[in-house]
């Protein structure tokens, strides 16, 4: 046998190696298929329906159509079309990966709450390196102990005395109302809301507002944030081919964000050093600082690490409240009856302060905001990668009522824009703006605008309060 290999023509060696490699891949695939079949049988799982694709191996047909949707700014309609005519749970192949699409609330509950440790974010967001050089670790990009650490850095988000403090909104809202065009004039309110939110959030995070309402040119950083988000989203979706694309516009936006962050991080580290020096000297250090950056810097002494943590908090959420509030106004402007009910509820409050408790007690105002969340969710999808073989409760079999096997490496995506218009939960008028539906029925996992489970958005109470406060002031 040794002699035979020694006499093997050199030109045949690559063919032999390729054949061995192919056989090894085939053998591994067969072993995995048997293993998954046995697990599915043991766990009572049934097959998931597949959506037809022209390319069932790499899914390049859907990759191309999604790329066009993202570039053409019609991604949400594209998602709706993807689900059209399909069962509530189905599978596709996308860039070679198995992706489970579902709009079952029970699957969302399992994904983010019951079996949440079987699903991760880090393999999707950090593993692909799509966010580099913008940022690496942050509360919305890591799992496990890294996530526990990142969450500890943003503890002020969870403090009631912070998110329930509406007095911090008063001066910025007074300023906004002063500079808005007079009654009767038609204007675009979105830029005003963006600058208002930029002032509100920079005061909370950095301890001082940017004064973007006074100086509109300072909102330049907002446009850079939008470019960073757009580029990062594209890179995440097209990570296998992202090195073939020119990202110079994205890198320029990152440079603006990094300069913005570096200036404030250098300043806070200098303030901490001075603070500690005064303590050692026995001098008065004044009242405790409550801004978020101060708290984060105390727990994270590394500049690059802090910039990453801060960027992944500030940039994705830079205009969350302003977009939500603009959408609420858009709907109320087209529904005079609903607007009249909001105004009546606010005016009945009289001249009393608009406290957190008062705003929570304005049920129709809250219903109007929730109905906007339902129709125009800021968080369009919830996406996780499976890190341990597990199951989801629904989607298997011809009726979709049996469990399904989710294998390590599978991606699960819940499309909330479709789920939140399911007639089963929202009646026969799911496309109609009707806040009363939130007064008629309590909703559970079919409506989780800020996600659910341990990784629920930590700023959910703050966003809801800020939007309610501004709408009430406008009323």
UniProtKB/Swiss-Prot annotation:
Q: What class of enzyme is it?
A: oxidoreductase
Q: Which GO terms describe its molecular function?
A: heme binding; iron ion binding; oxidoreductase activity, acting on paired donors, with incorporation or reduction of molecular oxygen, reduced flavin or flavoprotein as one donor, and incorporation of one atom of oxygen
Effects seen without this gene: Does not affect the production of oxopyrrolidines A and B.
Q: In which pathway does it act?
A: Secondary metabolite biosynthesis
UniProt cross-references to PROSITE patterns, sorted A to Z: CYTOCHROME_P450
Compartments where located: Membrane
EC nos: 1.-.-.-
What keyword terms does UniProt attach to this protein?
A: Heme, Iron, Membrane, Metal-binding, Monooxygenase, Oxidoreductase, Transmembrane, Transmembrane helix
Identify the InterPro entries for this entry: Cyt_P450, Cyt_P450_CS, Cyt_P450_E_CYP52_ascomycetes, Cyt_P450_E_CYP52_fungi, Cyt_P450_sf
Q: Which domain of life is it from?
A: Eukaryota
One CC-aspect GO term = membrane
Q: Where are the transmembrane segments?
A: 10-32
What topology does the record note for this protein and the membrane?
Single-pass membrane protein
A matching Pfam family: p450
* Residue pairs linked by disulfide bridges in the UniProt entry: none
This protein's cofactor list reads: heme
Per its UniProt record, what PANTHER family does this chain match?
A: CYTOCHROME P450 MONOOXYGENASE APDE-RELATED, P450, PUTATIVE (EUROFUNG)-RELATED
- UniProt function note: Cytochrome P450 monooxygenase; part of the gene cluster that mediates the biosynthesis of oxopyrrolidines, polyketide-amino acid hybrid compounds with feature structures of tetramic acid. Does not seem to play a role in oxopyrrolidines A and B biosynthesis. May be involved in further modifications of these oxopyrrolidines.
Family that this chain belongs to: Belongs to the cytochrome P450 family.
What name appears for this protein in its UniProt entry?
A: Cytochrome P450 monooxygenase opdE
Q: Which organism is it from?
A: Penicillium oxalicum (strain 114-2 / CGMCC 5302)
């Amino acid at each position: 046998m040794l002699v035979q290999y020694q006499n093997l023509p050199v030109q045949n060696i690559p063919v032999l190696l390729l054949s061995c490699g192919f056989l090894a891949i085939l053998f591994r695939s067969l072993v995995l298929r048997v293993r998954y079949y046995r697990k599915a049988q043991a766990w009572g799982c049934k097959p998931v329906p597949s959506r037809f694709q022209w390319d069932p191996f790499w899914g390049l047909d859907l990759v191309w159509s999604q790329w066009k949707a993202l570039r053409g700014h019609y991604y949400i309609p594209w998602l709706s079309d993807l689900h059209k005519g399909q069962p509530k749970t189905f599978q596709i192949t996308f860039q070679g990966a198995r992706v489970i699409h579902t709009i079952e609330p029970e699957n969302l509950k399992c994904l983010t709450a019951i079996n949440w440790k079987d699903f991760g974010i880090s393999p999707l967001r950090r593993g692909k390196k799509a966010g580099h050089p913008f940022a690496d670790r942050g509360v919305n990009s890591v799992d496990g102990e890294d996530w526990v650490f990142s969450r500890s850095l943003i503890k002020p988000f969870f403090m009631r005395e912070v998110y329930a403090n509406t007095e911090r909104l008063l001066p910025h809202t007074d300023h906004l109302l002063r500079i808005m065009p007079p009654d009767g004039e038609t204007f675009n309110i979105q830029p005003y809301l963006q600058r208002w939110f930029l002032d509100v959030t920079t005061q909370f995070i950095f301890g001082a507002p940017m004064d973007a309402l006074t100086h509109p040119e300072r909102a330049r950083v907002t446009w850079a944030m939008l470019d960073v988000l757009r580029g990062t989203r594209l890179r995440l979706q097209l990570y296998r081919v992202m090195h073939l694309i020119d990202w110079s516009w994205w890198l320029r936006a990152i440079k603006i964000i990094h300069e913005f962050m570096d200036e404030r991080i250098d300043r806070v580290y200098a303030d901490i050093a001075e603070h500690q020096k005064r303590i050692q000297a026995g001098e008065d250090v004044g009242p405790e600082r409550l801004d978020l950056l101060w708290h984060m810097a105390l727990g994270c002494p590394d500049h690059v690490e802090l910039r990453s943590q801060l960027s992944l908090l500030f940039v994705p959420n830079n205009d969350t409240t302003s977009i939500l509030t603009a959408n609420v106004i858009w709907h109320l402007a087209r529904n005079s009856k609903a607007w009249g009910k909001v105004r009546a509820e606010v005016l009945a409050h009289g001249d009393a302060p608009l406290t957190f408790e008062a705003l929570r007690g304005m049920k129709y105002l809250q219903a109007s905001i929730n109905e906007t969340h339902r129709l125009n969710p800021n968080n369009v999808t919830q996406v996780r990668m499976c890190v341990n073989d597990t199951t989801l409760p629904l989607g298997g079999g011809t009726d979709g009522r049996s469990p399904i096997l989710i294998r390590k490496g599978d991606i699960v995506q819940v499309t909330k824009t479709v789920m939140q218009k399911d007639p089963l939960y929202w009646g026969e008028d799911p496309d109609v703006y009707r806040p009363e539906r939130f007064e008629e029925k309590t909703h559970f996992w079919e409506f989780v605008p800020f996600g659910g489970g341990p990784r629920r958005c930590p700023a959910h109470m703050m966003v809801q309060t800020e939007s309610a406060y501004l709408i009430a002031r406008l009323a």
